[in-house]
Amino acid sequence: MWYACDEAARPRSAPIGILNGFGRALGDGIVGLQALSVAILVGALPKRPILFRLPNLSAMVRAIYTAADFAETRTLPWHFATNERPFEPDEPFARVIDMRDFAFDPDFHATAMIDFFLRKLGVQPGSIPASRRRNTWLASRVQPVAPDAPPGYILICPKASMRLRDMPMEIHAHIVRKALDVGPVVTQGHAPGTFVKNLIHAAPSTSLDALCGLVRRARLVVSTDTAMVHLADAFNVPCLAFFPTHRPEWRVRDYPHCQAVSLPSRLPLGIEFARGPEDEQLARSAWFPDGNDLGWLDRVMIPMLEQCAR
């Protein structure tokens, strides 16, 4: 939805406002800011639009928007959090693009995330080359800090922002076991107690530069559907990504270094929030299509591990 301001009251230099651009999650922000950088590049939007963001976001999410020097960020008061209440700006805007509650938009559940954001910003996705639909905006705007880890490690990311997409402990342990055959492993999850040598538990990153450094220095990222997949693309790091709730092409279609694995389940495709404990159980069962036999996991992992070991 777009709001147009009164022509007589609008100065020639009136800015563009974007409400809730681009949500509260780190991954959504990385992809949404790529769409915004493209919209500015092709002239669909003027330079430095104003992003109205809800308060009390995590430090890492705030850091992503601070890095995006092509936009200004302001606070969106909670009483304007949903589109049930028309936005009342304190100053004239050329137009206001309303992305409030986009997580509940049916189109968001059934299309590539980058395409969704581009269309919201007035850009036809098909007019943009695949190379511009990748997360190219970020790498030049951060200074990755190398982690305290051996060189050539494999980074495992089992946790997502939603428990619905978390990697089960048994899957995490199996991936760790196989990855240790190749070299040192850094995991963001709980380090299984049976693995000691060459296994490092990554403490939560204290800055965006540290998080980017953790990804940038990895030779391979193995992750569930989370922001780490988008960061791996931003730094051209090979990635093996698992998708228990979304079609992979809705997330990583344009990522040339990402091998995506779809995990079919009886959940509605594109579900964003668990409706109850049974949904979490359905998501978990998608990781075990053959019961306790994890041969399917070996078949997708081993070729990637062999390739990164060369």
Where are these regions (language model features)?
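Catalytic machinery of carbohydrate-active enzymes
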Residues: 1-310
